[in-house]
């Protein structure tokens, strides 16, 4: 005869298996988000080769088996970190890209304003999320490994801006022969700016922020400011030169 104090087997709580998160952790994405946040910081500082799953688990305060429950391999976690920063970047920049696309056919001051807003929005985003710069710089140290990350999380956004510039050129509102190089020049300059901020003193940071934004405005105004299309200038274009695109981005 079973004692009244005993709990019937079918009413006992199920035991938590090894590596499974606790019930409180299963109720929301907090553990996964903490893993991604800490992993992004470590990958940005050390690169994937210098970061182990054990390092990440220790930063989060869980064991490796619990980390494996969310990400079965380091490659999956590394990819998810890029997906996370890309989602944040797209959320910040998508409205600005849409404004640029609408202004492409108009040209003049609306296009110049949209370009400046997009460039400054990109710089603002990187300053607020510097790990984005260092995550990508670590990736680009090896030009061939991880090219799939570029295709998934960098080239689509670059391509949208390139196509907007190409549409503006085809509409005759700007003269643009090298949108591919123009976009990447701004991207690399912005990442270099964030790198300079990381090593600067407070006073140097203020100067860097001011001068870099001033340079961005001068760069864009020189290429795409009002009247540039009529003047025949813009990204190295000469009178009668055609728009040249060697490879458009899908």
Sequence positions of predicted segments:
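C-terminal peripheral helix-coil segments that are non-catalytic and often amphipathic
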Residues: 2-18, 124, 128, 158-171, ...
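Helix-turn-helix
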Residues: 31-34, 38, 42-76, 80
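Amphipathic alpha-helical interaction segments
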Residues: 34, 113, 117, 135, ...
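Conserved hydrophobic residue
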Residues: 48-49, 145, 174
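Short helix-capping/turn signature of helix-turn-helix
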Residues: 71, 138-144
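Hydrophobic alpha-helical connector segments
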Residues: 80, 94-129, 180-186
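Short, basic, alpha-helical segments at the C-terminal edge of helix-turn-helix-like DNA-binding modules
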Residues: 83-89, 97
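Amphipathic alpha-helical packing segments from all-alpha helical-bundle domains
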Residues: 90, 94, 113, 128, ...
């Amino acid at each position: 005869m079973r004692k009244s104090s005993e709990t019937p087997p079918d009413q006992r709580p199920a035991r938590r298996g090894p590596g499974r998160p606790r019930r409180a952790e299963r109720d929301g994405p907090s553990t996964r988000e903490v893993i991604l946040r800490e992993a992004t910081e470590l990958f940005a500082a050390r690169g994937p080769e210098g970061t182990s799953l054990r390092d990440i688990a220790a930063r989060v305060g869980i064991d490796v088996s619990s980390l494996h429950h969310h990400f079965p391999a380091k490659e999956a976690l590394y990819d998810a970190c890029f997906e996370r920063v890309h989602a944040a970047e797209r959320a910040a920049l998508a409205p600005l890209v849409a404004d640029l696309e609408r202004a492409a056919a108009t040209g003049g001051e609306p296009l110049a304003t949209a370009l400046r807003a997009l460039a400054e929005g990109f710089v603002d985003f990187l300053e607020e999320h510097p790990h984005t710069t260092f995550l990508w710089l670590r990736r680009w140290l090896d030009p061939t490994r991880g090219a799939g990350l570029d295709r998934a999380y960098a080239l689509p956004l670059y391509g949208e801006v390139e196509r907007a510039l190409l549409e503006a050129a085809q509409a005759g509102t700007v003269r643009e022969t090298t949108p591919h190089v123009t976009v990447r020049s701004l991207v690399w300059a912005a990442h270099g700016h964030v790198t300079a901020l990381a090593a600067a003193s407070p006073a140097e940071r203020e100067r860097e922020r001011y001068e870099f934004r001033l340079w961005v405005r001068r760069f864009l105004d020189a290429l795409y400011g009002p009247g540039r299309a009529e003047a025949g200038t813009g990204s190295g274009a000469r009178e009668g030169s055609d728009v040249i695109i060697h490879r458009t981005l899908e």
